[in-house]
Amino acid sequence: MVKISDRVSKILPSGTLAMTQKARELKAQGRKIISLSIGEPDFNTPEVITEAAIDALRKHETDHYTPALGIDKLRQAICYFHKRKDGIDLQKEQVATFAGAKFALYSVFMTLVDPGDEVLIPIPYWVSYTEQIQLADGVPVYIETRERNSFKLTVDLLNEYVTDKTKLLVLNAPSNPSGLLYTKEELLAIGNWALEHNVFVVSDEIYYELVYDVPSISMASLSQEIFNNTLVI
């Protein structure tokens, strides 16, 4: 029997997916279950999206391979989104699309992380960061945030964990799983700290649109220098 590689053998299954599968099994048994596992919306896909997908199929727009970085119209729409939401002036050449944020993050770590590079991850965090970084032969470094500070990352905490091997900081805001948000001043402090310490920021903003009472803030919108030092998911 073929042997699984040592690299993959070190990787643990996704805890959230395991919880989700268990919840499905219990529901199938007739149990009343409230699942707090995967971040899955409780509403259907908006009809305008469904109709656009059907229309693209009928027009045979999906019959062929797309450009490696994604469909031009989609990349241009992403530029427009960030201009409208954050005032960020993006060019199409600065945008790449992926089959989901998980694959985008995996591609980022495989592209930027060399063996032994350290990647800072504030706790609590989305479980797959760890496995993806380890697949890239990087070293996840977990920052112990504090409940009394709403689990927020601070410059003081960053100073405790940074070393000469630190390559990246993963910042997830709005946060999965805590839901925390940062103020503009807090993000600016983190962004400037990253510049000072030559640490590149991977800003995971996939919950950007799921904030309803206050505006979301993108790390890349704070200054041109921080923009140049940030990759937004």
Describe each region flagged by the PLM.
Residues L26, A136, E196-H197, I226:
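Helix C-cap/helix->beta junction micro-motif
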Residues T111-I133:
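Conserved PLP-anchoring active-site segment centered on the Schiff-base-forming lysine
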Residues H197, V214-I233:
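Conserved active-site segment immediately N-terminal to the catalytic lysine
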Residues D89-V95, P115-E118, K165, F227-T230:
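Short acidic capping loops at alpha-helix termini that bridge into adjacent secondary structure
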Residues V141, R146-S218:
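Active-site phosphate-binding strand-loop segment of PLP-dependent enzymes
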Residues V2-G100, S107:
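N-terminal small-domain helix-loop-helix segment of the aminotransferase-like
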Residues L135-V141:
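A short helix-loop-beta submotif of the ANL/AMP-binding
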